[in-house]
Amino acid sequence: MENSRILSCKYRTSFGSSNARRIRSKDEIPAVVYGQGNDVLHLKIKSNEFNKKFAKFTDNTVLILDDGKLERCVFIKDVSENIASKLIYHIDFYEVDRRVELEKYVPIKLIGASVGVKEGGILTVLKEQVRVKSLPLDLPEFIELDLTPVNKGDSVFLKDLVLPSNVRLAENDENLEVVTIK
């Protein structure tokens, strides 16, 4: 597991606005974890640890919350922050079972310079994300699509995407166009 995905956390037993302010004054962020049919867990996370890693997170980044005894597999559901001061007020995490496959939309990242575009063709992107199915820890943050070999008049379909091992398409029609060059 990448260390950049692991966040240390501690349980908290005090709640409410004044307690949240007290937590933030100690350079910690109040947070909750829900999902998996469990009760809501109230946590606090070190601000500096979260802020260092937060810029690298996407909607598909699976994080591991580690309290020293148990590791929870979570996604960030919501981050409440003051836009002017960049102070994070609160984080909501959604817990998933790391042993159960899930379906999630993943962005398609276009790379390379297409031969067809170099020849004067116009690239049209028809699909910016794709629904995939995998275990949470295998979920990619994006799917790369190399445009280098795509010629003028060609299309790339969902079935042409190169998916990481342990990841498969969850779309109904694999013959949908992702990009076309005309």
Curated annotation (Swiss-Prot):
SUPFAM superfamilies, sorted: Ribosomal protein L25-like (SSF50715)
A single Gene Ontology CC term: cytosolic large ribosomal subunit
A Pfam family hit: Ribosomal_L25p
A single GO BP: translation
Coiled coil regions, renumbered to chain: none
UniProt GO MF annotations: 5S rRNA binding; structural constituent of ribosome
Keywords: Ribonucleoprotein, Ribosomal protein, RNA-binding, rRNA-binding
Role of this protein: This is one of the proteins that binds to the 5S RNA in the ribosome where it forms part of the central protuberance.
Assembly and interaction partners: Part of the 50S ribosomal subunit; part of the 5S rRNA/L5/L18/L25 subcomplex. Contacts the 5S rRNA. Binds to the 5S rRNA independently of L5 and L18.
Family: Belongs to the bacterial ribosomal protein bL25 family. CTC subfamily.
Name by which UniProt lists this protein: Large ribosomal subunit protein bL25
Organism (species): Borrelia garinii subsp. bavariensis (strain ATCC BAA-2496 / DSM 23469 / PBi) (Borreliella bavariensis)
Gene: rplY
